[in-house]
Amino acid sequence: MSKGVLVIILILIVLSVALYFTFIYTPKCDNLQCWETKLEKCGRASYTNDAGDVVWQYKIEGKSKVNNLNKCIVNVKLLDLRKGSVKSLRLVNKEMKCAVPLGVISYPETNSESCSGPLKEGMQSLIIEQLYQYILDNVGKIGSEIADIN
């Protein structure tokens, strides 16, 4: 092999490594402090939050403009659900994308208004089903309370 071919191969390898670390590689945070630092600056990172009853996986995808405001796009995935109804289990492994204001440190799933995707839709569906069941279970009581108001 000639020196020219070897140099071209070496340049391609270096370029490939640079592209990988720039656009694909996402460092993992092992603790909350690392995650909060990355979230505040919207630097690429992933973090698994074991909150006891539920395990969330977060992945910062980068900055984006949403409604002319700079936001940090975070992918949220529900990895495990240890408590709750059987219906809740259908949310496991679903994801949603959340637009967190730049510089704000918060759990993205706490403000679902800024999120979209199958996980958000599933959570909303569960809430509606639970509300519907509550109304069915208490229709007599609700009716008598409304009658007492008049």
Explain the meaning of each model-derived region:
Residues 6-7, 35:
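Intrinsically disordered, low-complexity segments enriched in polar/charged residues with Gly/Pro
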Residues 18-76:
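N-terminal export/targeting and maturation segments
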Residues 1-4:
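Positively charged n-region of N-terminal signal peptides that target proteins for export
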Residues 55-109:
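Mature extracytoplasmic domains of secretory-pathway proteins
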Residues 7-21:
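Hydrophobic membrane-insertion alpha-helices, especially the h-region
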Residues 34-38, 42-44, 49-51, 79-82, ...:
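Extracellular/mature segments of secreted proteins
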Residues 110-150:
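C-terminal partner/receptor-binding element of secreted or periplasmic proteins
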